[in-house]
Amino acid sequence: MNRLVLLVILTVLLGSPMVHAREPTPAEMEAISKETRLVFESFLQLWQEERYFEMYEDGKKQSREILSLEEFATRMVELDWVPVGLSPEKPSEISYRYRTLLFMNANIVFSHKSFYDLQFTKPKAFLLQKEEGAWKFDLIQMIRSPYYSPENS
């Protein structure tokens, strides 16, 4: 019985730091928040300017293995909508999964490439994953957004 109690206590004491090691500390969350917001704003700026070759470099390794640079750029050019910016009504939020994996939840204002007055706001969750010391985006998600067609069309 004493061995069982000792084993349980050791398991709790030794296992507890491992469980908490996966969650960022408040200081780490603040640093991650600042870093990812800058990365996200930079990525959004590239998207606004339709600089798809540079966006591709910010893609996750898995995405780049599936999509070639040419495929990605072609699919992005074919999209009718580009972001104008972030909605001022609701600030972006970060949903942490681990120190190296998070979702940036943002309300993005999109504008039609041909009809500039046609705009809409859509909430989007962007997956960011840290690879080789840099935050990377899911490019597959990018070629599918924003999926909107005006009513009465």
Residue ranges and their predicted role:
Residues 1-4:
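Positively charged n-region of N-terminal signal peptides that target proteins for export
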Residues 7-15:
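Bacterial N-terminal signal peptides
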Residues 17-21:
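Sec/Tat signal peptide C-region and signal peptidase I cleavage site
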Residues 23, 28-31, 37-38, 42, ...:
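Short solvent-exposed beta->alpha transition segments
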Residues 31-32, 113:
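A generic structural signal for short
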Residues 94-153:
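Exposed beta-sheet edge and beta->alpha loop/turn motif
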